[in-house]
Structure formats: structure tokens, C-alpha cells
Amino acid sequence: MTKSELIERIVTQQGLLSSKDVELAIKTMLEQMAQALATGERIEIRGFGSFSLHYRAPRVGRNPKTGQSVSLDGKFVPHFKPGKELRDRVNDD
């Protein structure tokens, strides 16, 4: 599902909200989440999951075109850990 598909689903389910209002709310929420992660904060949405940063250590990678070894710097990457309710819902038979 893309962001625009999510907006359309919410607009369809919630008849009182305009497409512009839903789009603004989602863009604002995602921007706030990105800013929080950029400053090292952890985001927890109970019942859904948590977002945090994991450190990826420096390593040697390969250029897929040439096969040449390339040194990759260490960096932080966003990580999502699903909550129990989300895991149960996804795995519900």
C-alpha cells in the first residue's frame, strides 16, 4: 500500500474527513516520526510496534557490477519492531 492509497482508504472509511485533511495529517505524522528518529528518539505505538535506530558497524561490501571491495562506513538505520497485537493479527489463521 502506498501513502496515497492509505489516504484514499481513510477518506473512504471516514466520510467527514477531506482528502486534503487526511493527507496533511499523515504527512505531519510521518515528518514528526522522522524528526524524532533523526534526534535518536525511540517511537512506541502501543499495539502496533516501535521504531528505533540500530547501529550498523563498518564493513567491507562489494560493488555488484565490478565485484570490487568497497569500504562501508558505520551508520544508524531505522528499525521497526512489531508489537504483539500486530504480530498476532498478521499471523491469525
Swiss-Prot record:
Q: Does the keyword Aminoacyl-tRNA synthetase apply?
A: no
What the entry lists under InterPro entries is as follows: Hist_DNA-bd, Histone-like_DNA-bd_CS, IHF-like_DNA-bd_dom_sf, IHF_beta
Superkingdom of the source species: Bacteria
Alphabetical UniProt keywords:
DNA recombination, DNA-binding, Transcription, Transcription regulation, Translation regulation
According to the UniProt record, where is the region Disordered? 59-93
Record-level Gene Ontology MF annotations: DNA binding; structural constituent of chromatin
Q: Which GO terms describe its biological process?
A: DNA recombination; regulation of DNA-templated transcription; regulation of translation
**Biased composition, class Basic and acidic residues, residue ranges:** 82-93
According to its record, what are the GO cellular component terms?
Answer: chromosome; cytosol
Can you tell me which family this protein belongs to?
Belongs to the bacterial histone-like protein family.
- Known function: This protein is one of the two subunits of integration host factor, a specific DNA-binding protein that functions in genetic recombination as well as in transcriptional and translational control.
| Known partners and oligomeric status | Heterodimer of an alpha and a beta chain.
Q: What is this protein called?
A: Integration host factor subunit beta
Q: Which organism is it from?
A: Stutzerimonas stutzeri (strain A1501)
Organism classification, top ranks? Bacteria, Pseudomonadati, Pseudomonadota, Gammaproteobacteria, Pseudomonadales
Please name the gene that encodes this protein. ihfB
